Regions:
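Basic, Lys/Arg- and aromatic-enriched nucleic-acid-binding interface segment
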Residues: 2-41, 45
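Catalytic-site neighborhood detector that most strongly recognizes the C-terminal catalytic loop/helix
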Residues: 6, 61-64, 179-204
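Short, basic (Lys/Arg/His-rich) helix/loop patches that form interaction surfaces
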Residues: 21, 37, 111, 118-177, ...
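Short, cationic motifs built from Arg/Lys/His that form the positively charged side of catalytic pockets
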Residues: 26, 39-40, 74-80, 155
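Ca2+-coordinating acidic residues in Ca2+-binding motifs
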Residues: 43, 158, 189
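Conserved tyrosine-mediated DNA breakage-rejoining catalytic core shared by Y-recombinases
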Residues: 46-96
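Low-complexity, serine/threonine/proline-enriched polar segments
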Residues: 80-85, 93-128
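Short, basic, alpha-helical segments at the C-terminal edge of helix-turn-helix-like DNA-binding modules
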Residues: 202-212
């Protein structure tokens, strides 16, 4: 398991602000969507944003695109926007901007999205984004300050905020559902951020249920 290094809230805010100052609006939009909603990079091409600004991720990153398109296996999950302090409603505002199509995505990412159906894979979409981000100087500065930080740190940062940022943290089962993975996977990566009482309670309930079965 690679080290789980989150992009911390202050760094996330600074990165977004710098992207706007640098006129990198498309990079800003994609980075904001991934960071505010805890997405896998490739999921950017699976999003369905409704008129209220609610964000749904269509299915998982499956190889069989035809199954996805037919709806046979398509299970949308709701993604939760976690705001930054002092920016109420910003996640939803970003989602509505994404839905409007006013800004669009970086060209290299769009090129890969166009090839998704022939490749039956979304992996290159995420790789194209990661490459752009890694070449961006302010990101390189963040990596210097946080050795081991990767683009996936945007998603890890969402998990950190879910558990450590608010006085009312999400339960780990809720966070796992919003991130689109199992509770086991969630705890494998993020257990050190999860409320210890919750974990103890879960263990106790499990053992009680076992005895009463």
């Amino acid at each position: 398991v690679q080290a789980t290094i989150p992009l911390m809230p202050a760094d996330f805010e600074e990165l977004l602000s710098q992207m706007l100052q640098d006129g990198r609006k498309q990079l800003w939009l994609m980075t904001a969507m991934i960071g505010f909603y805890g997405l896998r990079e490739g999921e950017i091409c699976l999003l369905d944003v409704d008129e209220n600004g609610d964000v749904y991720v269509g299915g998982e990153l499956k190889r069989d695109v035809r199954a996805l398109q037919s709806g046979a296996e398509k299970e949308e999950r709701l993604a939760l926007g976690l705001d930054l302090k002092g920016q109420p409603g910003e996640a939803r505002r970003v989602a509505q901007l994404f839905r409007s199509g006013q800004i669009g995505l970086p060209k290299a990412v769009k090129n890969q999205i166009d090839k998704v159906s022939e490749r039956n894979s979304y992996r290159e979409v995420g790789a194209a984004y990661a490459q752009i981000l890694k070449r961006y100087k302010p990101w390189q500065e963040l990596v210097k300050r946080n050795p081991g930080l990767r683009p996936y740190g945007l998603r890890h940062g969402w998990a950190w905020r879910a558990h450590k940022y608010s006085s009312r943290p999400l339960h780990y089962s809720q966070a796992a559902a919003f991130m689109g993975h199992s509770v086991e996977t969630h705890l494998k990566y993020y257990s050190s951020w999860v409320n210890r009482k919750e974990l103890e309670e879960a263990g106790k309930k499990y053992n009680e249920a076992l005895q009463s079965a």
